[in-house]
Amino acid sequence: MTALITFDRVGKRFGNAVVLDDLSFGVRAGERVTLIGPSGSGKTTILRMLMTLTRPDDGTITLAGEPLFHERRGDTLVPAGERHLRAMRRHTTMVFQQYNLFPNMRVLRNVTEAPVHVLGLPPEQAEERARELLGMVGLAGKLDAYPSQLSGGQQQRVAIARALAMRPDVLLLDEVTSALDPELAAEVLDVLRDVARTFDVTMLCVTHAMKFARDVSDRVLMFNEGRIIESAPPGELFDAPTQERTKRFLRSVIDES
């Protein structure tokens, strides 16, 4: 199957720090891929690139058959303008560590705002979809609440519903439970398990929740110093890792949990 996402020899530096080092990998449509590894190994940078928030210094990223940061002019590729980037962003949505809800909008409007103003959906259609999604994440009774009236776990569930309301090809999840206590984190991870079962969406997830990664992933990528050092189905990578660095990382995560 042709890859929906392709990184081809992608490099990224911040000053003298190499964040991504000649990185190449692909993700198939509908695949659930989890990125694990120590902090600073480039995982979040990959998600930010797919949202066009960070540009690579080297290499090419392709999304849905089109170069992400370049556009075609005849037979040549030139740096992408804002119009191209805006069109490419419609393929992806991201749920961040912090919830980033609009504090002055009620829950329902937080979910309908982008579909109406970005996708151009009629308000009635956007609201019907939002009600359905908020029901799915267990918040049907909170439509008129403001974010400040919700727990952290509830706010993150609104953020998940908001992301799905955009009907993305790719759902990006960046440490979505890192700001939550264990009980609230478990609620959010249960919602994401339902998303993985219910929606035909490609998922790239950065997490330190190894049980969740095992449950939902088709493939797990272990990162270290801007490179993938191990790639395998979750049963293989967690039960029989081949790289010593992977073994040390998994031991450290288990010790912290």
Describe every region a protein language model picked out:
Residues 235-257:
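C-terminal boundary and immediately downstream tail of ABC-type ATPase nucleotide-binding domains
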Residues 3-234:
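ABC family nucleotide-binding domain
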